[in-house]
Amino acid sequence: MDSFSLLAALFFISAATWFISSRRRRNLPPGPFPYPIVGNMLQLGAQPHETFAKLSKKYGPLMSVHLGSLYTVIVSSPEMAKEIMLKYGTVFSGRTVAQAVHACDHDKISMGFLPIGAEWRDMRKICKEQMFSHQSMEDSQGLRKQKLQQLLDHAHRCSEQGRAIDIREAAFITTLNLMSATLFSMQATEFDSKVTMEFKEIIEGVASIVGVPNFADYFPILRPFDPQGVKRRADVYFGRLLALIEGYLNDRIQSRKANPDAPKKDDFLETLVDILNSNDNKLKTDHLLHLMLDLFVGGSETSTTEIEWIMEELVAHPDKMAKVKAELKSVMGDEKVVDESLMPRLPYLQAVVKESMRLHPPGPLLLPRKAESDQVVNGYLIPKGTQVLINAWAMGRDSTIWNNPDAFQPERFLDNKIDFKGQDYELIPFGSGRRVCPGMPLANRMLHTVTATLVHNFDWKLERPDAPLAEHQGVLFGFAVRRAVPLRIVPYKA
């Protein structure tokens, strides 16, 4: 053995000995042995959430991994998730911030990444009590129904022409239309208007950058060099989206000044203008602009992904599709666009959405958390600064929680009261605790109404009947986990 090989072997043995003794001494959660420099990154594969789920069966629901130089604990059970998100929610309220999120100082202004403090509480209060309150949702329902009608008209045109619909594309445009109507009262007369497509292009750009693996996130020493150009590209897309949103806000402010006696619109923009004009307001315009950015990027990408999964599962399971159609027919009759007030009378539709969220949480590892101080959980030490990932995908596929967990069986939710609103830790696609997704009330309504509109008015078939579905084609891990190949299905009247 030459001297270099001997030195390398001695280094590896020394590092391994130090690592093992250090872990035992500090009683860290168990986990796979990390390689020098790269840690466990080479073990992750294309679907990290699936890899973590498999490893957790060996190492347990609290598991240590090293992602480059970033020490991380993976949480894979409802019991441990509740400990992290509820019992020790204050300790684990911090965020690990990806380099892309530093674009336009988003990490310093966004409610999603701000530390828990006065600014965060003020923004959270605005979301809960004003923007996403039940009354606010009710007031803006009419605007969303108009956008659902545009989706229906688009599907009718495709049906008449025998043309397939790219469900991801249609869901993305519809979600943007629903959100822009709710936020801005945008009155675009076309399904795929120029403004909507501009939003789409920018948001897809943001999502592609935020979702791409970035070496600088795992090796912070590289951040000043931005080797993959992630920060530079993120600055461009974040800047464009913020400028677009600011334009709408300024237009509304000027309109209010020019016509102070004009009736107010039932949208979020009116709420934001009122907040800015309030004497006791402590927030700046930038806080509200970045809040809107979070809503557009987070809401459109995740809702789009989930709608595509719902439609795939229903097309793949005609018996479940028939049950949803029968329920919608009995409740809606000849009405074409569902009213949001009918949702409590559609338990099977609700069960379908829950089952899809269980199998396909759009963000399978949720947004990363960070320990703000040392904390012992389940007998293991989680040191200050540790990144914590909640594997919602693993909990949704856990055979100790769910019977036949890989099967699409909405009926399982007809016999229990489990919901995805953050109280039942078996099903937490929107997170839980103080960091739960603030836009969940709007996302919940969009998922149900878009699905109902598509299913109630048409039968559906694959563009290529011989085409395999996603389980055989693979999925793409990124900002949201979606199909590798877009779902293309043909609407028709049976």
UniProtKB/Swiss-Prot annotation:
Catalysed transformations (reactions): ferruginol + 2 reduced [NADPH--hemoprotein reductase] + 2 O2 = sugiol + 2 oxidized [NADPH--hemoprotein reductase] + 3 H2O + 2 H(+); ferruginol + reduced [NADPH--hemoprotein reductase] + O2 = 11-hydroxyferruginol + oxidized [NADPH--hemoprotein reductase] + H2O + H(+); 11-hydroxyferruginol + 2 reduced [NADPH--hemoprotein reductase] + 2 O2 = 11-hydroxysugiol + 2 oxidized [NADPH--hemoprotein reductase] + 3 H2O + 2 H(+)
Family matches, as SUPFAM superfamilies: Cytochrome P450
Known EC number: 1.14.14.65, 1.14.14.60
Keyword Transferase: no
Protein topology in the membrane: Single-pass membrane protein
Key words, A-Z: Heme, Iron, Membrane, Metal-binding, Monooxygenase, Oxidoreductase, Transmembrane, Transmembrane helix
Tissue occurrence: Expressed in roots.
Signal peptide bounds: none
Domain of life: Eukaryota
Enzyme class: oxidoreductase
GO biological process: terpenoid biosynthetic process
Positions contributing to heme binding: 437
Subcellular location: Membrane
Transmembrane segments: 3-23
Needed cofactors: heme
InterPro entries: Cyt_P450 (IPR001128), Cyt_P450_CS (IPR017972), Cyt_P450_E_grp-I (IPR002401), Cyt_P450_sf (IPR036396)
Molecular function (Gene Ontology), one example: oxidoreductase activity, acting on paired donors, with incorporation or reduction of molecular oxygen, reduced flavin or flavoprotein as one donor, and incorporation of one atom of oxygen
Any single GO CC term annotated in Swiss-Prot or TrEMBL for this entry: membrane
Major localization listed first in the record, in broad terms: membrane
Pathway: Secondary metabolite biosynthesis; terpenoid biosynthesis
Family, as annotated: Belongs to the cytochrome P450 family.
Function: Monooxygenase that oxidizes ferruginol to produce sugiol. Can oxidize 11-hydroxyferruginol to 11-hydroxysugiol. These products are intermediates in tanshinone biosynthesis.
Protein's name according to its UniProt entry: Sugiol synthase
Organism: Salvia miltiorrhiza (Chinese sage)
